[in-house]
């Protein structure tokens, strides 16, 4: 399979180690983080906040794609309506986390792979539509590698 995935590299600049080997830190603009075990949501959120802090302090540090599984929990985005939980938050059957992302309620559970992009978007176009289309193209390319046809629908992302 010689297909090349769609990619957009950030501008070049010095890299910092970020607990990577020096060779990887100097040769990578991004890396994949994929733990072997289930990661509690609150642990992953703490890791992401620390990684983001470092990315802000060292803007040309390697960026990351994290692929994780979480124990069962619910997350609620900034714009979410809590009535979409379908139960009282203080009487939840599972932990509930209000987090700094868009979107509605998400139920996470073992077996579900969650992808987090930890990127310095200031190194790319400051255009949400462009970013979403680039992300969409990466997913279309991955589907193609798996032998599944993916396509865009005009007006939707």
Regions picked out by a protein language model, each given a short descriptive name:
Residues 1-157:
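N-terminal lobe of the biotin/lipoate ligase/transferase fold
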């Amino acid at each position: 399979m010689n297909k090349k995935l769609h990619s957009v590299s950030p501008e070049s600049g010095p890299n910092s180690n970020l607990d990577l080997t020096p060779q990887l830190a100097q040769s990578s603009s991004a890396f994949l983080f994929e733990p072997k075990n289930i990661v509690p949501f609150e642990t992953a959120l703490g890791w992401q906040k620390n990684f983001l802090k470092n990315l802000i302090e060292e803007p040309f540090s390697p960026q990351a794609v994290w692929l994780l599984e979480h124990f069962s929990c619910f997350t609620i985005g900034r714009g979410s309506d809590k009535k979409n939980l379908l139960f009282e938050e203080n009487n939840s059957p599972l932990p509930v986390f209000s987090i700094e992302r868009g979107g509605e309620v998400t139920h996470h559970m073992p077996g579900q792979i969650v992808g987090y992009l930890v990127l310095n978007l200031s190194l790319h176009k400051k255009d949400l539509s462009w970013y979403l289309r680039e992300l969409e193209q990466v997913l279309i390319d991955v589907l193609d590698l798996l032998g599944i046809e993916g396509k865009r629908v005009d007006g939707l992302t």
